[in-house]
């Protein structure tokens, strides 16, 4: 005996209309087939809705355009018109703060973007701009929906334009938790932060097969565009997560340091600091080694200054010779930029300059004070550096500091040589408060290089060149390799005990809360891109 057919609701009655709505909601919620969901889970990936549930506060998600469907009839697409069209969009809260979100659904058309799909993303981005809340894009897509032709490409262009208009107005965060290929990669590239998952995320303009055909190069997905590649080599991403839950947790923590928009202050948990110097503070008095050639870990300095020693690092695997990230001082977010003597002696190179410049501009856009720790012997020498554009690309860091109007505090811990001294948040670029430790060496260059240039003939003509060089180097060090020449000219505002660093930063930030500074009227600057 066959099962009776499910009775369809009578949509001419109120009860029937309500039942019909429930049926449609059920269809929209389960737009992907059970088999597609199973395959997604088998890869260790979550579904679009599961990701939203993890990201947002429980019960806060409000979906938009749940019943949107594509209108294409090409190649039999009209036979398959799932609700939602392969992307879930809406708004909700993270830790009680409003955010907008879109989550691409790989279980529907492989997450491929079509016209209506793109319109949904554009609509939620416009909504975020209107309401002044961050937008988080969860990317897991096979790329453009080929069957819809140029309509798909047009949708990408509309998204890129919204990314650009929203830049510096609302925080934009991209979670790449699957493939993101072709033109689709440019949306995350424009956003403020990109988070990828190890062994799961892949981003590239052209895939391995096309590269093999065109250039003959053999490369796998992971090597070409995996999370490690984009975190350590290209600098496209800001964090490599172990799994999707880790990635989402990183985004939630990141949001806690960012304001909702450019007209808001970052979230603060005001707490008056105890300015008494502690034994922990005194550890900084011995952190810089006696030998100028011996490294130390700048992370230790950073953690001594921040509340509870908590430092939230960004781009930790990329350009490790410079450290960037967020922390709090008296419960208020600050951005940190610091040379890292443990890597390339803290030299600035192309990647470090661009990493720091982007970070400073992000902080400036979103009203986050920047604290800079300086220990830099100069720019990294090398033919490759010069040929790859260190002049133009290093200038980006100058531009970033010089146009920043947020509070800027700089602490010189040891070396500050040559042009790199100027570049690293110097008084000359507009820093508000410049401090130096007694161990600071602020000069055109180090003793050996200077003596070899200034006293080449004297050394050559002396009976004992080694003794003469050592004596002249000592004279140079005593005369110029200190913070006091700069202090005499007001280039540093104070020479302080290292153990007093947090106290000075706390007081400085208190005073700078009312800082008022504006740039000359202009359409925009012409940063040396």
Where on the chain are the PLM-derived regions?
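Ligand-binding clefts of soluble mixed alpha/beta catalytic domains
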Residues: 1-529
């Amino acid at each position: 005996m066959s099962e009776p057919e499910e009775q369809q609701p009578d949509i001419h009655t109120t009860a029937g209309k309500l039942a019909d709505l429930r049926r449609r909601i059920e269809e929209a919620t389960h737009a992907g087939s059970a088999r597609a969901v199973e395959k997604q889970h088998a890869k260790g990936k979550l579904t679009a809705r599961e990701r939203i549930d993890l990201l947002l506060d429980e019960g806060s998600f409000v979906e938009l355009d749940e019943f949107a469907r594509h209108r294409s009839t090409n190649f039999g697409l009209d036979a398959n018109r799932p609700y939602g069209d392969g992307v879930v969009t809406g708004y909700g809260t993270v830790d009680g703060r409003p955010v907008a979100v879109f989550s691409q659904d790989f279980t529907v058309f492989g997450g491929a973007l079509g016209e209506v799909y793109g319109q949904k993303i554009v609509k939620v981005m416009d909504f975020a701009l209107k309401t002044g809340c961050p937008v988080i894009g969860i990317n897991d897509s096979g790329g453009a929906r080929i069957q819809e032709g140029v309509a798909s490409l047009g949708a990408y262009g509309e998204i890129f334009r919204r990314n650009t208009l929203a830049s510096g107005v609302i925080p934009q965060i991209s979670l790449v938790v699957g493939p993101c290929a072709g033109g689709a990669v440019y949306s995350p590239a424009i956003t403020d932060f990109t988070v990828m998952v190890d062994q799961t995320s892949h981003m590239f303009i052209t895939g391995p097969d096309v590269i093999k055909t065109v250039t003959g190069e053999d490369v796998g997905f992971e090597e070409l565009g995996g999370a490690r590649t984009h975190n350590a080599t290209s600098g496209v991403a800001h964090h490599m997560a172990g799994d999707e839950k880790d990635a989402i947790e990183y985004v939630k923590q990141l949001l806690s340091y960012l304001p909702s928009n450019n007209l808001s202050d970052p979230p603060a948990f005001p707490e008056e600091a105890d300015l008494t110097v502690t034994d922990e503070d005194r550890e900084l008095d011995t952190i810089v080694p006696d030998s100028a050639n011996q490294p130390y870990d700048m992370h230790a300095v950073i953690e001594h200054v921040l509340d509870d020693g908590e430092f939230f690092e960004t781009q930790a695997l990329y350009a490790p010779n410079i450290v960037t990230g967020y922390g709090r001082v008296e419960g208020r977010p600050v951005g940190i930029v610091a040379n890292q003597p443990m890597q390339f002696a803290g030299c600035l190179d192309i990647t470090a300059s661009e990493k720091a410049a982007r970070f400073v501009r992000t902080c400036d856009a979103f009203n986050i004070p920047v604290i800079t720790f300086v220990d830099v012997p100069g720019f990294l020498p090398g033919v490759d550096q010069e040929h790859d554009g260190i002049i133009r690309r290093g200038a980006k860091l100058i531009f970033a500091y010089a146009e920043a109007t947020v509070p800027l505090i700089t602490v010189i811990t040891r070396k500050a040589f040559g042009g790199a001294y100027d570049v690293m948040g110097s008084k000359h670029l507009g820093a508000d408060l410049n401090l130096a430790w007694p161990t600071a060496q602020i000069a055109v260059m180090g003793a050996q290089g200077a003596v070899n240039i200034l006293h080449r003939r004297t050394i050559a003509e002396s009976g004992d060149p080694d003794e003469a060089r050592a004596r002249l180097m000592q004279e140079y060090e005593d005369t110029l390799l200190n913070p006091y020449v700069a202090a005499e000219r007001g280039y540093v505002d104070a020479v302080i005990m290292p153990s007093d660093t947090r106290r000075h930063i706390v007081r400085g930030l208190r005073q700078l809360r009312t800082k008022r500074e504006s740039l000359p009227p202009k359409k925009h600057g012409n940063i040396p891109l």
